[in-house]
């Protein structure tokens, strides 16, 4: 069994996927727009992302533009990235922080040589944890 996060974006999924390609080296394995699906797309969603799948390291993350009504609910989550060393932690944290908000600066903790939390410019919360 695997847990695969699915991220819903407010009409900026394509931009987010491209950002993760640059910031995290994400490898896109699939990207389909609503206009390419078998059914007629919701009005105004033709060029938005119906489904994207990309790899970050060995993990698969999926995403799309949310065409459903805006709902509020559970928001208590972060994506945690385990990185090999402090240099990778600094690079990854810095890349995700561009246009985002640092929630906890990258620093030494009792459990990690470098740990930090950042909300990227799309509002996705990330925890960067150095494992060595």
What feature does the model see in each segment?
Residues 3, 29-30, 50-55, 63-72, ...:
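Vicinal oxygen chelate
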Residues 75:
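Acidic/polar active-site rim loop that often engages polyanionic ligands
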């Amino acid at each position: 069994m695997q847990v695969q996060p699915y991220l819903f974006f407010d009409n900026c999924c394509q931009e987010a996927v491209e950002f993760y390609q640059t910031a995290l080296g994400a490898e896109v394995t699939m990207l389909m727009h609503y206009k390419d699906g078998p059914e007629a797309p919701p009005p105004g969603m033709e060029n938005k992302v119906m489904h994207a799948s990309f790899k970050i390291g060995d993990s698969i993350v999926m995403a799309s533009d949310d065409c459903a009504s805006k709902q509020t609910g559970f928001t208590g989550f972060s994506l945690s990235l385990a990185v090999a060393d402090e240099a990778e932690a600094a690079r990854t944290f810095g890349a995700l922080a561009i246009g985002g908000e640092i929630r906890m600066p990258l620093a030494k903790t009792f459990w990690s040589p470098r740990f930090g939390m950042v909300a990227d410019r799309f509002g996705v919360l990330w925890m960067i944890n150095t494992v060595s």
